[in-house]
Amino acid sequence: MQIQTILLCFSFSFSAAFYFHAGEREEKCIIEDIPSDTLITGTFKVQQWDIVRHDFLESAPGLGMFVTVTTYNDEVLLSKLYGAQGTFYFTSHSSGEHIICLESNSTQFVSFGGSKLRIHLDIRVGEHDLDAAIVQAKDKVNEVTFKLQHLIEQVEQILKEQDYQRDREENFRITSEDTNRNVLWWAFAQILIFISVGIFQMKHLKDFFIAKKLV
């Protein structure tokens, strides 16, 4: 039976590195709130529990991780099987929450290593792998060019985040105004109902007193 766990939910950030534990065939997910047209880079590494040493090994040989990325509209942006460590990429098509899930692809490790895994995950928003690019640079000019390009991308990402936050604030303001307007109209409708009921009761009592010749 497949188990799915939502680990955490956090808003837009440039980088989030952490680790978590997972069991046999247990799918664990995180939720990222991402602006549209944004590159996401995820790097992961799996460590296997050693029941003899009572510690995690440096790797998990023979094990793989199945990575899926979906939106809340059930649009699949990524669905791929990787090894015990790897890097995945995807680009958001629209603003909003994106669900990133990881699941081990085998249960063979249970018989010799226990059912516990430690998964290290580093999520980077709007960033390319600058270090790898610099290593491949042939001279200082190329290195400076890569760094400058990286800086430009960061500035563009900050501007994109600001636009996204402004859009969220505008949507929240519109929702709040609509809610306040609905509350005001409902209060006005209640007042009209109370006045109508009062007039009806007064007329009913007046007719009753006249019929009984009390007035």
Swiss-Prot record:
Coiled-coil zones: 136-171
Stretches in topological domain Cytoplasmic: 186-215
Subcellular location: Endoplasmic reticulum membrane
Residues covered by the GOLD domain: 27-125
Membrane topology: Single-pass type I membrane protein
Keyword terms of this UniProt record: Coiled coil, Endoplasmic reticulum, Glycoprotein, Membrane, Signal, Transmembrane, Transmembrane helix
Keyword Coiled coil recorded: yes
Span of the annotated motif COPII vesicle coat-binding: 208-209
Chain segments annotated as transmembrane: 168-185
Lumenal compartment residues: 18-167
GO cellular component: endoplasmic reticulum membrane
Cited PANTHER family: TRANSMEMBRANE EMP24 DOMAIN-CONTAINING PROTEIN (PTHR22811)
Function text: Part of a complex whose function is to bind Ca(2+) to the ER membrane and thereby regulate the retention of ER resident proteins.
Family per similarity comment: Belongs to the EMP24/GP25L family.
Protein's UniProt name: Transmembrane emp24 domain-containing protein 11
Organism, as annotated: Mus musculus (Mouse)
